[in-house]
Amino acid sequence: MRRENPRWEYRRETSAYDKSDYRSKFYKGKWEKAWIKNRIQYALDKKIDLYESMWEGYVDKTEHMPKSLFKFFPFNHNSLKCIETNSVFMNNPSNFNDPFDCLLCANENEFLKYCLLDYLKEMDAVGREILSQDELNKLEHSYCGDWEQHNGSIYNTFDSVVTHICYDPELRKERKGSDEISRKLYYDRIKYENGLKELRKNMIQVTSFANIDDFKLTSYMELWAHYAQNHEGFCVEYDLTRPIADSRENAMILGGLLPCEYGAKQIILSKRKIYKYINKIPLTAYEQMELDKSLMLSFITKSSSWKYENEWRLLLPVDICKIYDNMIPFFPIKAIYIGCRMHRDNREYLYCLAKHKDIKVYDMSMHKYNFELEGEYCEADINNYFQSKEEKRQRELR
């Protein structure tokens, strides 16, 4: 990957807010987290859900919004439908190629411990002499975190305490009730795994964009290889400076757009909220907001190995996406960039489509000497292309 040459350009930028305000373009912290926190408090005050609060407060992140966003497509029927209808397809995270993308993480042992404690108390396990009160207390205070961060004894961990409850080392045999406890843990583990899968699948739909410039468009070959069918597809530039015609849809889209964060660790969901959600226990309004926030942060957090994409994501609730059949109206298309390996028939189809919709088209070509695309790309002269093609056909018929 080539290094971008520094650009020396003086522009006096201003902000409507103080630089300590998250709404300012000069804010040094994670503005998106501050914005989400503000939207949560607003939602609690107004007694509305988090997404509605985000849609109402989209203007507070105006200074952070890019002027354009790019999306790479393979050449197929679904991609062409997005161009024809000026919409984007909202995908389910379970369909993503990267298994770590939008993966929901929680402390499994904490969940199992809460389930087991509730069960043992409900079934009067101490009275039935399955375990003593001291053992129940030890289970309640057992450590469930990462072993690397544990400073105490190994015998205080959840797995060790459960083993002690189920097995008598002196008699070298299983204790009374061990089968019952093992069976309970087995089914709760299945419930935990299915619960997280359900939460990931049934809450939020996602579509992705790249916030890039001309340099990255022509030099970041991974984007073309991964998402544009090995350069046989195309890239669409959307103009965010021109609002969507429907003001409600405009607010919904701008409110749902957020930049991705990159790091080495995933977001860990709250143990109590996950416990209540999986066991169908009603959450308080605040707990639901916090769970929604954690889900949202999980869906915009990716491995640092993907940082070059500079990705933005549109997040919308599943029930909203169903209303639109997952095809959400988006900002006007500013330009289409055609991959350097696109087949001629496909290229001509895009030419016709772009001409009909009055969209600029650029043909990308390989650089002669570098591992990149030509940076000096020109707008395709569609009328001249088809005129020349017709003249050639007429000559061949003579």
Feature-to-residue mapping (PLM):
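Partner-binding and oligomerization surfaces adjacent to conserved cores of proteins
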Residues: 2-398
